[in-house]
A protein has these predicted regions:
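C-terminal peripheral helix-coil segments that are non-catalytic and often amphipathic
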Residues: 1-3, 99, 103, 131-143, ...
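Hydrophobic alpha-helical connector segments
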Residues: 77-107, 152-159
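Helix-turn-helix
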Residues: 13-17, 21, 25-59, 63
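All-alpha amphipathic helical-bundle segments outside canonical DNA-binding/catalytic cores
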Residues: 88, 123-128, 142-158
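Amphipathic alpha-helical linker/stalk segments
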Residues: 2-5, 62-92
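Conserved hydrophobic residue
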Residues: 31-32, 120, 146
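A contiguous binding-surface segment within folded domains or other stable secondary-structure elements
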Residues: 106-138
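N-terminal intrinsically disordered/low-complexity leader segments
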Residues: 1-13
Length: 202
């Protein structure tokens, strides 16, 4: 009897189910504490299917992280290709990253887990993925928009790490008397912009 081949649509649906299940477990438990058996059970699939689609648990982990950032990065790269750098563009990119984390708490959980496990492969810190953003900072320095006595990579990491840390820890500050009556997110973003752009401008 001839075996029935899995249709491409079925294969893609299975792949998505595995990714969704792995994402949920990695965010809740971390990479090291999550087994392929747990992912298979949650995704209603088999370990053999997971290995077929992703080769290994590490391969699956990479794809889980990658898909949370891919749209943001590609959108920014498309904007970068339209012309010369401006302060408004950099400011909009900062706001877009802030909104990305604000609207995606699961991504924040994944970033927190990656940091706890010292995962150097995390997409947020991938050098190739961040290269267009570093280059944009460098262009802003060359055109006199930003100060040139600070490495462009430092400028990028300063602003992204401050924003990332805010979303990882903001619940800890929600009860501070100094912050009562404020919209915590919008107020913090405004402060980040003031400190970064005033300090980084030439």
């Amino acid at each position: 009897m001839t075996a029935i081949k899995r249709r491409p649509r079925d294969a893609e649906a299975t792949r998505t189910q595995i990714l969704d299940a792995a994402e949920s477990l990695f965010a809740a438990q971390g990479f090291g504490s999550t087994s392929l058996a747990q992912i298979a059970q949650k995704s209603h699939s088999h370990k053999s299917l997971i290995l077929h689609h992703f080769s290994s648990k590490d391969g699956l982990w990479q794809v889980v992280k990658e898909r949370r950032f891919s749209h943001f990065v590609e959108e920014r790269k498309s904007l970068f290709s339209r012309g010369g750098v401006t302060l408004d563009e950099i400011r909009n990119s900062v706001r877009a990253y802030f909104e990305l984390l604000k609207n995606d708490p699961l991504l924040v959980q994944l970033l927190t887990r990656a940091e706890l496990e010292q995962d150097l492969s995390c997409s947020q810190y991938d050098e190739k993925r961040l290269a267009p953003f570093v280059e944009r900072m460098r262009e802003a320095q060359k055109t006199g928009l930003l100060r040139s006595d600070v490495p462009p990579a430092h400028l990028l990491l300063i602003v992204t790490n401050v924003i990332t840390q805010w979303f990882e820890a903001r619940a800890m500050f929600a009860g501070w008397s100094e912050l009562e009556g404020e919209n915590l997110d919008s107020s913090f973003l405004e402060s980040v912009e003031k400190v970064f752009f005033e300090g980084a401008k030439k």
